[in-house]
Amino acid sequence: MPGQKIRIKLKAYDHEVLDESAKKIVEVAKSTNAKISGPIPLPTERALYVVLRSPHKHKDSREQFEKRVHKRLIDIIEPSPKTIDALMKINLPAGVDVEIKL
């Protein structure tokens, strides 16, 4: 498929699982002789939630919760049909969100 590019965006709360998944995708794509750019680490989304510890008073006592979303980007340049078939068969761990653009 000349001139075509597949962009894969991965998101997860756990960066270790995310890096493992990115490594699997890169290995599969390289085994089918596709050109690869990445995995490129994108900025981590960080959300902070502050909650009162008690139900109705003691405003000075608060608890903080944080949610981080780690992201990686992988570009597969000029993929073959063999590459696409191999990517469809990959079994990734739960907790990894995969977004694919052609």
UniProtKB/Swiss-Prot annotation:
GO-annotated molecular function: structural constituent of ribosome; tRNA binding
Superkingdom classification of source: Bacteria
Pfam family name, one: Ribosomal_S10
Transmembrane segments: none
InterPro entries, per the entry: Ribosomal_uS10, Ribosomal_uS10_CS, Ribosomal_uS10_dom, Ribosomal_uS10_dom_sf
Example GO biological process: translation
GO-annotated cellular components: ribonucleoprotein complex; ribosome
Keywords: Ribonucleoprotein, Ribosomal protein
Subunit text: Part of the 30S ribosomal subunit.
Function as written in the Swiss-Prot or TrEMBL entry: Involved in the binding of tRNA to the ribosomes.
Protein family (similarity comment): Belongs to the universal ribosomal protein uS10 family.
Protein name: Small ribosomal subunit protein uS10
Gene: rpsJ
